[in-house]
C-alpha cells in the first residue's frame, strides 16, 4: 500500500495521542520496530515508527501537535484485514471520548472512527478510498 492514511483528532483542545503508551505497546506487539524522533523543528511529523521485518511491515509518523498520525506504508499477507485491525489498534491511543477521523491523503474519504468501530467498517473504507 502506498497511499497515506491519516488518523486525525478533530477537536484542537481535545487532548492528544498517547505517545508514551503507544511506544511501549508498539515494542511489545511489533518487536523489531525502529523508532526515530527528529529534533528538527522544520519537520511537521517528528516521530517515525518503521518495521520491515517478517509479518506486517509499516511506516507510521506522528505530527508535532500529537493530533495526527499518518500511516504511510502498510503491507502484510492479509493486507486489507490486517490494515483494518492496525488502524483500529492505533485508534485506541487517541482520547476515547474525542472524535477521530480516518481520511486518505486526498481528503476524499473522511470517516469518523469510533473506538467501537468494526473491522468490516474499516475494510469497507479501505476499498472505498482505494487504499
Predicted regions mapped to residue ranges:
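A broad, low-specificity signal for short, low-complexity segments enriched in glycine/proline
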Residues: 28-37, 60-64
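Charged interaction segments
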Residues: 49-131
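Residue-identity detector for threonine
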Residues: 4, 19-21, 33-35, 48, ...
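A common structural junction motif
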Residues: 24-34, 91-98
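Short, extreme N-terminal segment that most often corresponds to the first beta-strand
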Residues: 1-32, 130-131
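Short Gly/Thr-rich strand-loop-strand
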Residues: 37-50
Amino acid at each position: 500500500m502506498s497511499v497515506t492514511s491519516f488518523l486525525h483528532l478533530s477537536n484542537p483542545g481535545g487532548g492528544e495521542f498517547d505517545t508514551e503508551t503507544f511506544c511501549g505497546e508498539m515494542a511489545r506487539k511489533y518487536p523489531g520496530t525502529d523508532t526515530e524522533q527528529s529534533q528538527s523543528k522544520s519537520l511537521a511529523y517528528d516521530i517515525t515508527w518503521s518495521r520491515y521485518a517478517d509479518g506486517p511491515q509499516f511506516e507510521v509518523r506522528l505530527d508535532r501537535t500529537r493530533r495526527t498520525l499518518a500511516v504511510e506504508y502498510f503491507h502484510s499477507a492479509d493486507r486489507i484485514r490486517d490494515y483494518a485491525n492496525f488502524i483500529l489498534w492505533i485508534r485506541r491511543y487517541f482520547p476515547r471520548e474525542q472524535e477521530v477521523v480516518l481520511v486518505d491523503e486526498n481528503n476524499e474519504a473522511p470517516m469518523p472512527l469510533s473506538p467501537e468501530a468494526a473491522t468490516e467498517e474499516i475494510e469497507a473504507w479501505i476499498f472505498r478510498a482505494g487504499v
